[in-house]
Amino acid sequence: MHVHKGLIFLSFFSPIYLSLLLNGSIFFFYYAQRALHDSFFFPNELLRCQICLCSLFWMVTVINLKRFFARMVNISIYQPSRNRLVRY
């Protein structure tokens, strides 16, 4: 039985991963809302790094969830279907 490596990663690092994701999301939405209301607001380098890390974490999460649900419903999106010869 094949277990996806990303799911092992997510299950092993889930407390750290989710806290980083939540922390980055809170900072991202707070500063995005602040930047919308203040046209002279520019985020500093630390905030830019945090926003980039948050978007990277979200991207990895979405990719892993897509692969996980594709395997759950047994649809091979990422691999071409192989025709196997069944012998009786």
From Swiss-Prot:
The cellular location(s) given in this protein's UniProt record come to:
Membrane
Is Transmembrane helix given among the entry's keywords? yes
Keyword annotations of the record: Membrane, Transmembrane, Transmembrane helix
**What's an example GO cellular component term for this entry?**
membrane
Q: How does it sit in the membrane?
A: Multi-pass membrane protein
Please list every transmembrane segment annotated in the UniProt record, as residue ranges.
Answer: 8-28, 45-65
Predominant subcellular localization, coarse grouping: membrane
Record's superkingdom?
A: Eukaryota
Further information in the entry reads:
Partially overlaps ECM8.
State the protein's name: Putative uncharacterized protein YBR076C-A
